[in-house]
Amino acid sequence: MKNFDKFSTNEEFSSVYKIGKKWHCEGVIIFYLNSYEKKIAVVASKKVGKAVVRNRSKRILRALFAKFERYLRDGKYIFVAKNEITELSFSRLEKNLKWGLKKLECFK
């Protein structure tokens, strides 16, 4: 995630949620907005679990994003963890995330 910045304002989140594409995968929802900027946000609500579980979920999603980062187009990405993310293995989540990114046409 060296090349990607974090979201800084609420308006950035709103624009991606409203204008961007959305795809539901097992364990995660992916939002993508094609842009010249490279930004990422990882979100886990309290529905996912307590703070320890939410932080672990976000760490896993960041690690998976770092794995795919060099193959992705520039744009704004938001990954929202679902409550079932805690039950999935890393490899299964990786497969689902790759499939979702492919469906959103995020790969170069």
From Swiss-Prot:
It is an enzyme of class 3 (hydrolase). Its EC number is 3.1.26.5. Coiled coil: none annotated. It catalyses: Endonucleolytic cleavage of RNA, removing 5'-extranucleotides from tRNA precursor. One of its GO terms (molecular function) is ribonuclease P activity. The keyword Hydrolase applies. One of its GO terms (biological process) is tRNA 5'-leader removal. It holds the Pfam family Ribonuclease_P. GO terms for cellular component: ribonuclease P complex. InterPro entries: Ribosomal_Su5_D2-typ_SF, Ribsml_uS5_D2-typ_fold_subgr, RNase_P, RNase_P_CS. Keywords: Endonuclease, Hydrolase, Nuclease, RNA-binding, tRNA processing. RNaseP catalyzes the removal of the 5'-leader sequence from pre-tRNA to produce the mature 5'-terminus. It can also cleave other RNA substrates such as 4.5S RNA. The protein component plays an auxiliary but essential role in vivo by binding to the 5'-leader sequence and broadening the substrate specificity of the ribozyme. Belongs to the RnpA family. Consists of a catalytic RNA component (M1 or rnpB) and a protein subunit. NCBIfam families: rnpA. PANTHER family: RIBONUCLEASE P PROTEIN COMPONENT (PTHR33992:SF1). This is Ribonuclease P protein component. It comes from Campylobacter jejuni (strain RM1221).
